[in-house]
Amino acid sequence: MLEYRAGTYDVVVVGAGHAGCEAGLAAARMGCRTLVLTLNMDNVALMPCNPAVGGPAKGHLVREVDALGGEIGLNTDRASIQMRLLNTGKGPAVHALRAQADKRYYQLCMKKVLECQPGLDLKQALVEKIMVEKGKVRGVLTSTGARFEAGAVVLTTGTYLKGRIIIGDLSFPGGPNGQFPSVTLSDCLADLGIKLGRFKTGTPARVDRNSIDFSKMSIQPGDKKTHNFSFISEIKEREQLPCWLTYTTEETHRIIRENLHRAPLYTGVIKSQGPRYCPSIETKVVRFSDKPAHQVFIEPEGRNTTEMYVQGMSTSLPEDVQLAMLRTLPGLERVEMMRPGYAIEYDYVVATQLKPSLETKAIPGLFTAGQINGTSGYEEAAAQGIMAGINAALYVKNREPFILNRSEAYIGVLIDDLVTKEIDEPYRMLTSRAEYRLLLRQDNADLRLTEKGYKIGLVSPERYAKYERKKKLVEEERQRLEKTMVAVGDEVKRVLEAANSPGLPQQGISLAGLLRRPEIGYEHLLQIPGNHPDLPDEVREQVEIQIKYEGYIKKQQAQVEKFRRLEEKKIPQDIDYGRVRGLSVEAREKLEMIRPASIGQASRIAGVTPADVSVLLIYLERARREGRKEN
């Protein structure tokens, strides 16, 4: 094959899924000449699985990407066909927005954003090789011989690396939705010394809306109130489409059990580990054999298609078995299957080989983001993508990397878990993974991150000005509520009684004091006579949360200060752990392999005990005093 020089860029992004789109846009918006390469121009921002964005923890990630200046939130708002705020009966830490998206319109909108982004080129090509010279990345080589030179390369290849599609006893090379896999790039990474693993994921069948009897299902409408993921979206209303709820039956389970001998998960055809929190229907039936039924949601894939997504029935069973079990569900007795479900096995990069910036430790200038790092989900991919794009841009500008820690963002939790812990299954973000989740709420992502996005050049001056106005309104209103005292007259008594808030104050009380009562919301304060400013709902929500949960927030902030002290104790990257006496054998091996950046990160490595951390602290302090190189 004859090679030719096809172009020179600051940053080349390989892959245009949810990670690749964010990485490319971030690098270009930070002033880098950027190239995004995709296997198929018609599959930019493809949603090969669930046509949905958000949910617990995942919605938090979307809000954080948006606050930094990313695109997934805005694009979801454009393409949404239904939105719901989940967990409203619980505390604000776990409130989460979830949207159904028109998957085709989502792709078209995101593709247009990339095409219109100054400094970004979008091209179709199959990348076969990462070019490395003198230990540093120098660009990529495509299957047609095109050589694109670059100062940094971001790999966002999703599940395409040596992808293998499995349906029953049928198995063939392929990517999601019948696309081509990437084979030689996986071999190239292995040749470069990058350790790879192998995971599995899957998707359910798509069925024809015209063959469904919805009268036998429960309707799941969107919220009447209009929600948006992006803090700068101006969409005031949208026409929504409902989802539908049905259940598996004993007959469903019987068909599955009688065909386990044809299930690749149980015949040994699939050997790799799948996602724990999104198991196949055959796994659910086997694992929870005492459960008579499982929820199944029927979700529209878009406004201009009859395809419906069967959420909760991911499977790799043969096609005939899939159709038979689908027809045992209420409402699906005569259903027609438009696409079968399938499993896909793929190579991934063991993420402990990455720095917190998502740059590979072995090859400077090479970054990885998304499912190639062993994660699952569009949101996790987008979060890694924007961070990899930011850090690739900073790398070519010889600037310090941009790192978010666990106390600052769910993004920080996600990346720290990936680069610190040895994951053995596709990683999914959960609210339970965040120690400081009361501080990392979806409602305050802009207050946490927009200023950071502005400083690195991702957030526009116009957006930053809007953020500052909101921040000022929140501070002013909070001060007003703290300072405004009201007498406990008939009006206040009437409001408290109507809200079933017991125990009347014996004397005057501030509006903030009233708001701290569990039964009292901001809407109750508006019923008390006085001058109430006309404020946006998002400002009122923020003020109410800050006041009502003030004690808990302060307690968590104190915990964060302890965390930060450990994070600030840096460990030199060239430290010789062989010289650190007193470490256990396992701890020394793990520390040598992962090479944590701080004492805090070291303490989170499996196999590193508190005693090992103490030994390391003593060693570093002694080295500092003696003025050794490890200082």
From Swiss-Prot:
Binding-site positions, NAD(+): 274-288
Q: Which Pfam families match?
A: GIDA, GIDA_C_1st, SAM_GIDA_C
Set out the biological process GO terms recorded for this chain's protein.
tRNA methylation; tRNA wobble uridine modification
The UniProt record lists the keyword tRNA processing: yes
One GO molecular-function entry: flavin adenine dinucleotide binding
Residues recorded as binding FAD, renumbered to this chain, are 15-20, 127, 182, 371
- Key words of the record: Cytoplasm, FAD, Flavoprotein, NAD, tRNA processing
UniProt function note: NAD-binding protein involved in the addition of a carboxymethylaminomethyl (cmnm) group at the wobble position (U34) of certain tRNAs, forming tRNA-cmnm(5)s(2)U34.
Q: Know the name of this protein?
A: tRNA uridine 5-carboxymethylaminomethyl modification enzyme MnmG
Lineage per the UniProt record: Bacteria, Bacillati, Bacillota, Clostridia, Eubacteriales
